[in-house]
């Protein structure tokens, strides 16, 4: 068992919410599910959900400039051959102004959370201006 598995926890309720998020039926709409690490308990807990996004930039507008977050994103896009694809990826939001103790907590939790949430692609952002449709499209293709 890795040290991260002993250090961090995630409740069954939160895992069910992540599964529900992953299995949404409406794949043509962008959604974001925001999670945070409770500093005291080291539990990963929900911090909000943004539904029916018009653009990924709306996610950036919701983020704090001092608090890191894990954001699961269901992102409808067209493949090079024109088919609709809805990849699930994670934005690892770690703003430059984050206190060092929080930076270390989130850095330690990142790979563990990526594994338990079964997300294979991670887009790292330190500035809200990094989260753009162009940057995400380039990242996913």
Swiss-Prot record:
Keyword Nucleus attributed: yes
Predominant subcellular localization, coarse grouping: cytoplasm
InterPro entries, per database record: ADF-H (IPR002108), ADF-H/Gelsolin-like_dom_sf (IPR029006), GMF (IPR011171)
Pfam families, per the entry: Cofilin_ADF
ADF-H domain ranges (all copies): 6-141
Signal peptide range in chain numbering: none
CDD domains for the chain: ADF_GMF-beta_like (cd11283)
Keywords: Cytoplasm, Cytoskeleton, Nucleus
Highest taxon of the lineage: Eukaryota
Locations listed in the record: Cytoplasm; Nucleus; Cytoplasm, Cytoskeleton, Actin patch
An annotated GO BP: actin filament debranching
Molecular function, one GO term: actin binding
GO cellular component, one term: actin cortical patch
Stated role: Actin depolymerizing factor involved in the control of the disassembly of actin patches. Binds and suppresses the arp2/3 complex functions such as the promotion of actin polymerisation and branching filaments.
Oligomeric and partner information: Associates with the arp2/3 complex.
Family of this protein: Belongs to the actin-binding proteins ADF family. GMF subfamily.
Protein name: Actin-depolymerizing factor gmf1
Record organism: Schizosaccharomyces pombe (strain 972 / ATCC 24843) (Fission yeast)
